[in-house]
Regions:
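Acidic, low-complexity cytosolic segments
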Residues: 1-19, 23-103
């Protein structure tokens, strides 16, 4: 099992998570568009750069800018932001070493 597979599997075991993907964060990708808009709002409010976007509706999505033009996407049940964020932070050193192909 590759390091990427182990990482995604570990994150999928976080409570409420139904799917995890790692994306190239291009400007036309859905995560890229969400980050661009969130970054625009953050800068307008003098908050600095946007590092994470959490969207909660019937389902929830957490987008995390992991660097190198990549975005980690967790999707699942609403109401688990704290757990998801903790899981991403706990795995951040491994994510930073990840140089495999992304979606």
């Amino acid at each position: 099992m590759s390091m990427l597979s182990r990482l995604l599997t570990a994150l999928e075991h976080t409570e409420g998570v139904e799917a995890v993907t790692l994306h190239a964060n291009g400007p036309q990708s859905a995560p890229g568009v969400a980050f661009a808009e969130a970054d625009r709002v953050a800068k307008n409010w003098d908050l600095g750069a946007c590092l994470q976007v959490y969207i909660e509706a019937e389902h929830a999505v957490l987008l995390d800018d992991v660097g190198d033009g990549r975005c980690l996407r967790l999707e699942g049940a609403s109401g688990h932001y704290g757990r998801w964020r903790h899981a991403v932070e706990r795995h951040r050193p491994l994510i930073g070493r990840m140089h495999e192909e992304v979606a």
